[in-house]
Amino acid sequence: MNKHEIIQSLNQYVDQIVEQYKHEEFTRYVKSKKVTFEECYMFLEPRDPFIFGQTKSRWKQKITFRTYKHRMQTEIKCSCPDWNHNLKGKQVPCKHIFALIERYQSKRNHINNTIKGE
């Protein structure tokens, strides 16, 4: 997979997460508007691309979209207690994951233009 295909797959995955859980987890979605990030970046390794974020309250989030078959293809992780105790097994996003997705979506055009320029 080249970088453009990885970005397209990642875009589809984060859109799917938001559409699937936006109404179901509405309170978490609304609370995500208050989350602020200390650092946030995207790593485009061909086999294991991911988006990473760390909030001001030091919780760490990671959205992974793997391209090889012997591991879980898509995975979300957060270090907050709400996600670890209630949502981890179901792979349901917490407010921090929703905030990370929203941050990624706001930078999507810039990322696409950067990839096209390479």
Residue ranges and their predicted role:
Residues 1-118:
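Long, low-complexity, compositionally biased intrinsically disordered regions
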